[in-house]
């Protein structure tokens, strides 16, 4: 049986105020990070050197956005976290509702209204050696801060992409559906892309088809139809990817999930990426080839606007009320 967290943490109330703290002080105090039931300052937030998340990249994570005092698609992110954990035989020592409340509490503790959450579950402290059965308990870490993945001008002018030599791992190695802490292939692909002068890299699968970028899903517009690589191609079923697919349907546009070659990206009328941190960002150039006119196209701009309107008006309230399943 999983033991509950020690009762050392008083979750901030739904009003946004933490018992015993002055709200004016809260807004100026250093970043507070949630680790296993307690809040720590950035300088005090530490995990053991024997944590298997550090030693072996053994754990799972989610990146989550919040806008205008609402967490966007919180339940979907938490569900995916638990699915990833189940896939790697990792028991999260809390319920979905408790993890949701930990997330909301961390935002309240930092008195934030717009930002980014990094939710991490490590295998926990164990011994040297791969066996996860030496780890007694998983650790839950929540960081609520801000993020700016790309400069604002890139959302107006578009990114530069390049194909990476590092391939997306095969399904028979570790499913791309698992958001694990082992992101080394993505890191190496990012290094390759930036070394070539690009800002993001396109990762292919073992068969040479387009999978995704190092941290984002890919969409192509051709003759008014929107295309995206299939999940079977090695792309993550991104939360933002799913949202954009909904927005495409609402806009009355046709959407197709297909296998894509680099040729399909080279000859696209429009190309854009989606991700929690990136949101929806246009692409201007890929492998030294201009995409369309070299500027964000009308469908891309429409979807960016629809996405921004959606995230500002929907989501789980942070301060108005506590999470209700």
Briefly describe each language-model feature range.
Residues 2-202, 206-209, 236, 246-325:
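Conserved alpha/beta cores of soluble small-molecule-handling proteins
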Residues 201-202, 209-232, 237:
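Glycine- and Gly-Pro-enriched alpha-helical subdomains that act as flexible
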């Amino acid at each position: 049986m999983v033991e509950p967290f020690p009762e050392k943490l008083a979750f901030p109330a739904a009003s946004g105020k933490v018992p015993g703290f002055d709200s004016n002080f809260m807004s100026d105090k250093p970043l507070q990070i949630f680790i296993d039931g307690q809040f720590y300052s950035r300088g005090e937030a530490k995990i053991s050197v024997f944590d298997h998340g550090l030693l072996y990249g053994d754990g799972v994570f989610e990146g989550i956005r919040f806008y205008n005092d609402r967490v966007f698609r919180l339940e979907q992110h938490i569900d995916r976290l638990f699915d990833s954990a189940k896939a790697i035989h990792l028991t999260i020592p809390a319920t979905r509702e408790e993890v949701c409340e930990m997330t909301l509490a961390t935002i309240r503790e930092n008195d934030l209204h717009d930002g980014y959450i990094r939710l991490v579950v490590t295998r926990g402290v164990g011994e040297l050696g791969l066996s996860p059965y030496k780890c007694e308990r998983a650790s839950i870490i929540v960081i609520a801060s801000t993020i700016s993945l790309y400069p604002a001008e890139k959302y107006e002018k578009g990114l530069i992409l390049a194909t990476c030599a590092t391939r997306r791992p095969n399904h028979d190695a570790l499913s791309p559906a698992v958001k694990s802490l082992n992101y080394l292939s993505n890191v190496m692909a990012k290094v390759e892309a930036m070394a070539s002068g690009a800002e993001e890299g396109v990762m292919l699968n073992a068969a040479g088809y387009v999978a995704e970028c190092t941290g984002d899903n890919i969409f192509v517009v051709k003759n008014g139809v929107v295309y995206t690589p299939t999940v079977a191609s090695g792309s993550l079923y991104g939360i933002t990817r799913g949202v954009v697919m909904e927005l495409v349907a609402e806009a009355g546009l046709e959407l197709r999930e297909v296998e894509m070659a680099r040729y399909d990206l080279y000859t696209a009328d429009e190309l854009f990426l989606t991700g929690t941190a990136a949101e929806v960002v246009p692409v201007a150039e890929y492998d030294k080839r201009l995409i369309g006119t070299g500027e964000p196209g009308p469908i891309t701009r429409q979807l960016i606007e629809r996405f921004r309107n959606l995230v500002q008006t929907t989501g789980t309230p942070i301060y108005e009320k506590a999470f209700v399943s």
